[in-house]
Amino acid sequence: MSLPPDAKPNFATLPSAASLADPLASPLPDRLTGLPPVVSEHTVVLILGSFPGAASLRAGQYYAHPQNQFWKILQALWPQHPVPPAGGPDAYPARCAWLLARGLGVWDVYASCERAGSLDTSIRHAVVNDFARLHGRCPQLAAVAHNGGESFRHAGAVLRSLYPPLPPPPKPLAHDAAGLAGRARDDVPGQPEPTVSGAPTVVATRLPSTSPANASWSFDRKLTAWAALMAQHGLM
């Protein structure tokens, strides 16, 4: 799938040249704040991690750790479209534009947390992102792809936040009950209400984590799972 070249990244700030040169140089605060979403109106699959690792927070970039296989897997999925190489002040915006042009988006489940190191098991006092912010910004969204188990734990809450359930239809007033008998013969009581026009159907899927901590899955096995989801939603 190839999207219009004018699809632009949606993120707040770019990392400084100093942080790009040495992402391990700056200390991190006790309370960590995540990165803004990278999405567009063309996003079909939203990839949700748990929370950026230390290297990603210092660089201000998603999946900046060189051993994370995220970008490597995406390149293997679309070999005909080279991923812009890492490094340099323009590399990350170019990578975000590349990702959006594939119909993807990226964000994390947690907006902030306390964590020593980069492991999900060390996350404490986490605050979940406000996914209602994406309602209306991603009209083509069809799937939320959870990059790992910690993210997938919140799959139900994410979907409910994205698209809250509609309230039940009001019951007929007592004085209107007699009017039910006068309805057309094909208006059968007890039939389900029609679906709301334009109401999206978004599914949640757990994908194997691209983190280097997920060493039990080979690269090829991860790639197969990721490819199946992208093909299912017409992105390959």
Regions found by a protein language model. Give the residues of each.
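Short, solvent-exposed loop/turn segments at secondary-structure junctions
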Residues: 52-55, 68-69, 111-114, 149-153, ...
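Internal catalytic-core helix/loop-beta-alpha segment
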Residues: 101-153
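Short, hydrophobic/glycine-enriched beta-strand segments
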Residues: 40-50
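Hydrophobic packing residues within well-ordered alpha-helices of enzyme cores
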Residues: 74, 154-155
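Conserved active-site segments centered on acidic
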Residues: 46, 54-57
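Short, surface-exposed acidic-centric catalytic microdomains
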Residues: 56-123
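C-terminal capping/extension of enzyme domains
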Residues: 2-37, 41, 65-66, 119-132, ...
